[in-house]
Amino acid sequence: MTTPSLSSILRHTRPIFKETLRAARPTLQNALPNGFRIASESKDGDTCTVGVWIDAGSRWETEKNNGVAHFLEHMNFKGTGKRSRQDIEFGMEKMGAHLNAYTSREHTCYYVKCFKKDVPEAVDILADILLNSKRTEQDLDAERQTIVQEKEDVEARIDEVLMDHLHSAAFEGSGLGLSILGPLENIQKSITKGMIDDFVKTHYTGPRMALVGSGAVDHGQLCDLASKYFGALPTGQPKPSGFTRFLGGDKRETNQLNPLTHVAVAFQTPGISHPDAIKIKVLEQLLGSYSRDKGEAAYSCFARAIVMDFYDPKVGQFFRPNKAGHNPIHSLNAFWAPYSDVGLLGFYAIAEPGKSYGHEWENILHYAMRELIRVSRNISEEEFERAKNQLKLQTMLQLDGTTNIADDIGRQVLSFGARVPLASFFEQLDAISREDLIRVGPRVLLRQGPRGGGDWRHGQRARVRRPAGGDLLRGPLSCPLCTPLPRQSVVCMA
């Protein structure tokens, strides 16, 4: 008996799927006179997520105050004029609620998961910690060691460190090139109460904040609460709109204690609000991922290229696992990191050094680049439809739960000014043709820019000593197969 493909199943169920999407509750949105926005998606039930999303992250920092947005997140839980830290914690426990926050490169979010009846008190606490936090010098000094410990935990994760290096190489000299936690010197000494207060004054303004609700929420009630607690926020200065300059290059850090090689390669793309953004989402899904631990029966381009024999006429050899069945590539995953004005599309690979299909580990880059170039020029109808269907499924899965929905609403309201209905997103996705992707792929992956990593075969590399171990190498990456990498690219290795 033949098992039908995922594409054929979804093709036949598409009409029913569209009706289900049309029946979904709409996202309601209003704004206060000061620009503060309120957005919500309600559904039947007893629980919900309410939170405040703020257009303020590490990209709006400088090298001098790098880390201040994340430091502020910690300080806002230390107490206000009418609530101590213990009062805030007790208030959450009394409601059976959960208070949390996160800081990213572009956004900061504070949210509460609670019962419907407790929404007014939850918003009261959120407004209090955001607008009335005391942020004393004593609390500031006490929190430094906590953040240092958090930084040590993050730096123990190679993937986190590598992605920070990737952003630093791609966007050096701009806010997107800065890490979220900031350097150790800033955390331990440089960040002051004055810096934090200035950051709040500049970025915590009406037009850059939104109250978001998802689940058992009443939109009218949220509007009243927003007017009560956030109506007096200043409009502030317009958000900076400076162009983020993509530089490219490569960074490498040697760690003899790590038995595996981690490699990340990325290319400049348009930002999340660009008309081609949805096509880049499909391209990311098309490339997909491969994991040796999950087996090799996968359908993504990366997975199939690793599993199948891959012959390179230039080298005259097959690139495949050796006869003993040992595959040196542990994983190969595509990613897209989009921001408001720019993005990074690329892949992250983990492999055993010196064992990459009989060549040096740098051949992972060359091998993966061949697949990137192939899909940017020649995509079959089957893999194209599969990628679109998988993107639909992935999008639906990411919207599971009130917190995920609230986060989606908050980020879209800050990025686009409104949330795109899921049905509209799927209609846009269905309208994309294979030719559209073939048009966008080369423009992203093969573009020639004024700066970047240059040809892999040529150029000098500057050596910079890092105090915490290893050498950090900057400059063009040499490739033993002598294949150029597009200039608008960035390479990081650890």
Curated annotation (Swiss-Prot):
Location in the cell: Mitochondrion inner membrane
Keyword Methyltransferase: no
Cofactor descriptive note: Binds 1 zinc ion per subunit.
GO cellular component assignments: mitochondrial inner membrane
Membrane topology label: Peripheral membrane protein
Subunit structure comment from the entry: Component of the ubiquinol-cytochrome c oxidoreductase (cytochrome b-c1 complex, complex III, CIII), a multisubunit enzyme composed of 10 subunits. The complex is composed of 3 respiratory subunits cytochrome b, cytochrome c1 and Rieske protein, 2 core protein subunits, and additional low-molecular weight protein subunits. The complex exists as an obligatory dimer and forms supercomplexes (SCs) in the inner mitochondrial membrane with cytochrome c oxidase (complex IV, CIV).
Protein name: Ubiquinol-cytochrome-c reductase complex core protein I, mitochondrial
